[in-house]
A protein has these predicted regions:
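Catalytic phosphate-handling regions of large nucleic-acid enzymes and associated NTPases
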Residues: 2-244, 304
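C-terminal interaction appendages of subunits in large macromolecular complexes
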Residues: 2-24, 31-35, 40, 189-192, ...
């Protein structure tokens, strides 16, 4: 046995006590002896837990506050830093993101393409691939991206963002982004961690806004998935997106004539080539009777299924759903990170959390803006008195020996006016008065100064009203988002209750029964003999 390790028998011989659970905590190596010794069980137990925790918290599972995985958050943060209104090369965005994400350019590039294909946060230019056909995006040096207007409206605000040091300590990155929208439910997510996974289906933009408004009003709401690929969905067992639920998604199939079926939309997660292959394989196995499959997909999905002579199109339709990728079952698993731990929630709980978070962020923004306006009002009042009273022209001020003496004199002259100010006058305020240029003093107009002060007071009053009615203000926010962006996101997936298709009956219906009366044979392969029934 190697000198580098000892097993449990040797450990017991050395009279090292073993805990009741049979595991040892990992201990530093014993460097007193010539050989380095580790205790295997403790080492692997601790290291595996560290690895599992890292993958769960830092790689695969989204955070409930902003609905983003770390790599997505870092991409958006980098794009905001690069943002000047113009498109940036994806290769440049990937390189910039590597300042914050230590896992290489490939993972960043793939995550960026997935974000772009969801058509919500990123405005894309160039060949970004096709989720319908499964075609990949062009090389990063050929495609460009910038933040969408929606992302700029709802995702960023440095004043309400909590920051942390990046992995190498050279930069700051957001702990979570201040997203004022249920982004996690709009985009959906899929991630496989160690010991758990997360699969949240995407939902409709307008329905999310309506649900948030209903929640704020204390009304009931229901949310069901909506997919970019369209199709139809049976949500009777959705179970609010919780573990154990399931949805069935079907392709949209139209009957052109008795001999031809047309597939116009494919199920979520499937591609046109994949659906075509599944139909061909089902045909080869004798599950369905078709003559050929023709893929005419370009901008829109168009798959023509040409039926064999004498085959019923209605029965073939059922067989396509039963034996091909024209129908798929999806099991959601709503797992998110909250307070540095994974939690399994319902879709409704996620929306409520996101809506509460939005309300909190809007309140913070109002309070920050109010504080800035109060500072502006305070200094505008100081400036008005400083210039109107011509304090800067007084002999004692002009003969001040130094800045401290000048500040002391100004403070003394302002003392009678203290009741007019909204807060105490500080030395920093007086130093700002000393920084006023003569050109500004010469252009001073009392009426304009009074108008400016009145306008600031009016804005403060408006903010106070919003803070007093913060729920109504948040409802108006969601309504604004719906009015501004909702037309781009109509529901694409039809909600339906599917009839149960029994595979055995469908196969039987696709078989024809023949009989050879002379030889006494009966079966489905005697196609030259007398036809009896389907």
């Amino acid at each position: 046995m190697s000198d580098d390790f000892i097993d449990k028998e040797e450990q017991n011989e050395e009279n090292i006590p073993t805990p009741e659970n049979g595991h040892l905590d990992y201990k530093p190596a014993d460097t007193k002896n010539t050989g380095v010794k580790h205790q295997l069980s403790g080492m692997y137990q601790n290291w595996f837990l560290d690895y599992a925790s890292y993958v769960i918290l830092e790689r695969a599972v989204p955070h409930i506050n902003d609905g983003l995985k770390p790599v997505q958050r870092r991409i958006l943060h980098s794009m905001k830093r690069l943002d000047d209104g113009r498109y940036n090369k994806v290769a440049n965005i990937v390189g910039h993101t590597m300042q914050f994400h230590p896992h290489g350019d490939a993972s960043i590039g793939d995550a960026l393409v997935q974000l772009g294909q969801k058509d919500l946060l990123i405005d894309c230019q160039g060949n970004w691939g096709n989720i319908l056909t499964g075609d990949g995006a062009a090389a990063p040096r050929y495609i460009e991206a910038r933040l969408s207007k929606f992302a700029l409206d709802v995702v960023f605000n440095p004043k309400t963002t909590e920051w942390q040091a990046s992995y190498d300590g050279r930069n700051k990155e957001p702990i979570t982004l201040p997203v004022k929208f249920p982004l996690l439910l709009a985009q959906g997510v899929e991630g496989i961690a160690v010991g758990l996974s997360s699969k949240i289906l995407p939902h409709n933009f307008n329905e999310l806004c309506d649900a948030s408004i209903a929640y704020l009003r204390g009304e009931e709401f229901k949310l069901y998935p909506d997919f970019q690929t369209g199709g139809s969905i049976d949500v009777s067992r959705y179970n609010d997106g919780e573990r154990g639920g399931m949805v069935k998604v079907r392709a949209k199939i139209n009957k052109i004539d008795n001999k031809t079926l047309s597939i116009a939309e494919v199920p979520f997660g499937k591609t046109v080539p994949g659906v075509c292959d599944s139909i061909v394989k089902a045909s080869e196995k004798g599950k369905i009777k078709i003559r050929k499959v023709e893929d005419l997909t370009s901008e829109k999905v168009e798959i023509l299924v040409h039926l064999a002579p004498g085959v019923s199109s209605d029965k073939t339709l059922d067989a396509l759903y039963a034996f091909t990728d024209c129908e798929v079952s999806i099991s959601p698993n709503c797992c998110v990170i909250d307070e540095k731990k994974p939690h399994f929630l319902t879709v409704s709980a996620v929306l409520k959390k996101a809506t509460d978070n939005t309300l909190s962020l809007l309140r913070q923004e109002l309070e920050i803006h109010k504080g800035e306006l109060l500072e502006n009002l305070h200094f505008a009042s100081l400036e008005k008195i400083f210039i109107e009273e011509r304090i800067y022209k007084e002999v004692k001020f002009e003969q001040s020996e130094n800045t401290d003496a000048a500040c002391e004199f100004i403070d003394e002259r302002l003392t009678p006016f203290y009741p007019q100010f909204i807060r105490e006058v500080t030395k920093e305020d007086i130093l700002k008065l000393l920084d006023i240029k003569m050109a500004r003093i010469l252009k001073f107009n009392k009426d304009k100064a009074d108008e400016n002060i009145a306008r600031i007071k009016e804005q403060i009053e408006e903010i106070n009203n919003h803070l007093a009615h913060i729920v109504e203000y948040t409802i108006d926010w969601y309504q604004m988002l719906k009015d501004k962006y909702g037309k781009q996101y109509p529901r694409r997936t039809e909600l339906r209750n599917f009839d149960t298709i029994e595979a055995a009956k469908v196969v039987e219906a696709n078989e024809k029964l023949y009989i050879n009366r002379e030889e006494g044979f009966i079966g489905t392969a005697l196609k030259k003999d007398e036809f009896i029934a389907n």
